[in-house]
Every structure is written in C-alpha cells, then in structure tokens.
C-alpha cells in the first residue's frame, strides 16, 4: 500500500500484541495501531484523527486565539512589568506559530494585535529605559548583565559553559529550531532585554564587555569604534571578554571563535575535542544576520524569505541541513552547559518615517545619530542627552532617535525609490518586542 499510495493513511487492526510487530508497524509509518477487541469510539477517533485532523486543529486553534485575543487586549491596557511583557510576547509568538501551522485566516487579526502591542511596548521602553540604565540593580536582565548573572555563577559552581551567540536570532526563529534539539538536550527557555540601539556594534560589545557602550569607550578607548569611523565595529570582542573576566577576577581560560559560513563550522568541528579542557568557550555565528541583509539586497533571497513564516523556514532549514546541527550533537557529548542567545532581533518594516540630517548621519534604518536631525517626534524615541543612556556622543550636539513599531527612516531625497526598496525588509536598531526581547536558552545534555 505504501508503495502504491505513499500518502494514504494506513491503520493496522490486529489481535497480535507482540512488541516486534508493533515496532515493524511503527517503523513502516502507519497512521495508527489498534488491538482487538476494538471499541466503535476508537474507530471514530482514528477516522477523525486521520481524515479531519487539519480542520479540527484549525478550528480549535482559532477558538483558542479568539479567547486569548481579549485577554491580551485587556493586558495591553494595564501597566505591565518587564516579566509580564516577556510573557505577553511569548504568547503572541505562540499564536503566530500555531496559526501559521494550521493555515488559519486570522493572520490579519494577529498582525494588528502585534502592532498594538509594539506601540504599547515602545511607550513602556520610553518610560523606563533611562531608569534601567542608571540603576542596574533595579532593571530586568539586559545585555551587559549576561556574563555576570548567567555565565559566571555556572563557572563558580564548577560547570563548563559554551556560549553560542547567533547574531540576529529572534524568539520565533528559536522556536522554529528548538524541536531539532529536544532529543539531545533538556531545554530551559527565557528572554532578556537588549540595550539600545538594537545593533551589533552596541549590543554585542555590551554583552562581551559587561558594560554599556559609553563605559566601554571611556574604559577601553582603543577597543571602541565610533559610527563615523570606517573600520569594523566588532573586531575587539575577544579582548572585551578578557577584560570582563579580569574585572571580575575570574581566572578561567576561554576560547573565542567567530564563524560566517558552513565551511568555518566544519573546520571548527575538527577541533571540538580541544574545547573539553576549557571552562568557557564563546562562539559567534553570523549566518542569520547575513541572511537578513541578503534578503534586503537580493531579489531572489527576498522571494525565498518573503514572509515571517518563510524567514523562519529558511532559518530552520539552515539549522537542520548544515554542520551547525552536528556541532550541537557533539556538544551534547561534552557535558557542557550550552547557552544560546543573541545580541538583538529584527522586525519586518513597512512604514516609512521621514528624517533629515547632514551627510555624517549613520545609515541604519531603525536608529539615527547626528546633529540637526529633523523627524516626526511621534514616530521615535528621541534622546537629546545620550550620556543619560550611557551612549557615546561623538560630537557635543549629537542626538539619537530610535524608530518604534514597524517604521523605518527614509530621506526625502529619492524618497519613493528608497521606500519601495526597503519596505517589507527585516531591519534592527530600534524599539520593538522582536528586536529587544530576545532568546536566552540554557541546554543541558540529556543523560543516556
């Protein structure tokens, strides 16, 4: 039957209870296995499961979201705490994945609720962010706190730690790949808040230094590169890690590697056994960030990753079919605490917001810094005193603005071309749940 009609569900009904028969049936991918005597309701359940499952799952999912829609809406009218925002974002991502998997027609309803949530989240960040920066003991876990609060305690407890930073990994992308790891690891999921701007130069350096950007520039001026300079902005990460370990009087040896393609991962796999002697190993993988930028610049990649679901699908396919999957299998054998995180997420933008500045203004579409910026104040979080947020101020009159929601900055010159080119691209640097609430995952190898 499977040879003739491979997609036809086959249900085996038998009196035979021998385990090897069951194993053969399961190995042949039968749809169900019933042992006589069979109750009529068992037959009905099997028929429903194999003939009407899609419709039933879709109906139950839609009903579940309709019920939760009202509860989420009520929450958005309240003053949520940082932890409550994390939980609300988890629920929105849960429904996004559930509705996408059932082909539901409720996508527009969810999209509008996410836009409302992001507008409220931006107000929340504007209200609290400066206080978080100025009072580290009163803030949620943020980029500069990761080593101090997540990694050092494990090292102190005698655990070996492997920190894997997947640049530009969003929470929904993590959920898409997490199923690939469930057989090898016990998974503990959390989210943390990135700093602003949600860009690699700032957020990843803050993670590795354990400091805010202005503090890095003041303490290690030779390791910080300002926006207007041409050299790479993240070339000193290993040195920043070393300085952070030194500041906290940690004596552990560490390794650091940055990988941009599958070939580099394959090469690393040949050295994996050498990591076993090192307490802390740090690995940065840039594939998702490269994919995000390629999607903007390449028409073909934009078509392949045209929607949020397609973007997740490419991430999942990359994880499943490249040496990165083998890397995780080998790490599972080394008995490490494996921490997966990222420096920032990204958001699909489709609302242009005009901005005017001089020629020295940076090129990022979600945040700008410079002098004499002209913009729509309702569209941004404006920071006229960067030092209050511990951000560098290359010139005394430099101000920062951060885009909120799904907006992106566009210049009046050649405006229509600019808008058409960047609409529906994934960008980062501003304020949204997708950019700021990012995965912090702990994996522990399962005992065999």
PLM-predicted stretches and their roles:
Residues 17-19, 24:
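Generic alpha-helical hydrophobic packing signal
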Residues 4, 15-17, 50:
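Short, conserved "switch-loop" micro-motifs in signal-transduction and mechanochemical regulators
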């Amino acid at each position: 039957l499977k040879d003739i009609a491979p997609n036809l569900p086959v249900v085996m009904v038998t009196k035979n209870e021998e385990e090897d028969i069951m194993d053969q049936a399961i190995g042949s991918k039968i749809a169900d296995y019933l042992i006589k005597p069979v109750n009529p309701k068992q037959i009905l359940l099997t028929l429903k499961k194999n003939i009407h499952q899609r419709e039933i799952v879709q109906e139950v999912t839609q009903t579940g979201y309709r019920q939760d829609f009202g509860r989420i809406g009520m929450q958005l009218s309240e003053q949520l705490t940082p932890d409550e925002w994390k939980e609300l974002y988890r629920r929105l991502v849960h429904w996004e994945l559930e509705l996408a998997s059932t082909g539901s027609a409720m996508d527009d309803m969810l999209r509008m609720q996410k836009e409302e949530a992001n507008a409220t989240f931006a107000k929340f960040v504007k209200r609290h962010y400066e206080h978080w920066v100025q009072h580290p003991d009163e803030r949620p876990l943020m980029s500069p706190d990761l080593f101090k609060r997540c990694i050092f305690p494990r090292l102190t407890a005698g655990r070996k730690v492997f920190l894997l930073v997947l640049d530009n990994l969003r929470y929904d992308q993590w959920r898409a790949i997490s199923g690939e790891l469930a057989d090898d690891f016990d998974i503990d999921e959390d989210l943390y808040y990135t700093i602003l701007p949600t860009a690699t130069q700032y957020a990843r350096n803050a993670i590795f230094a354990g400091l805010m950007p202005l503090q890095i520039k003041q303490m290690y001026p030779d390791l910080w590169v300002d926006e207007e300079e041409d050299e790479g902005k993240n070339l000193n990460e290993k040195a920043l890690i070393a300085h952070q370990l030194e500041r906290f009087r940690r004596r552990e040896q560490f390794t650091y590697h940055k990988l941009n393609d599958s070939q580099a991962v394959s090469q690393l796999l040949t050295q994996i056994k050498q990591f076993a002697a090192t307490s802390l190993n740090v690995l940065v993988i840039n594939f998702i960030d490269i994919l995000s930028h390629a999607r903007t610049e390449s028409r073909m990649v934009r078509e392949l990753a045209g929607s949020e679901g397609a973007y997740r699908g490419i991430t999942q396919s990359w994880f499943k079919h490249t040496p990165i999957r083998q890397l995780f299998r080998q790490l599972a054998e080394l008995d490490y605490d494996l921490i997966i995180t990222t420096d920032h997420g990204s958001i699909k933008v489709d609302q242009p917001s005009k901005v005017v500045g001089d020629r020295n203004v940076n090129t990022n579409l979600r945040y700008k810094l410079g002098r004499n910026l002209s913009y729509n104040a309702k569209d941004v979080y404006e920071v006229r005193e960067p030092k209050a947020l511990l951000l560098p101020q290359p010139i005394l009159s430099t101000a920062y603005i951060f885009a909120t929601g799904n907006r992106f900055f566009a210049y009046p010159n050649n405006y229509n071309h600019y808008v058409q080119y960047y609409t529906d691209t994934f960008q980062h640097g501003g304020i949204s749940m997708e950019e700021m609430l990012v995965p912090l995952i702990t994996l522990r190898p399962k005992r065999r």
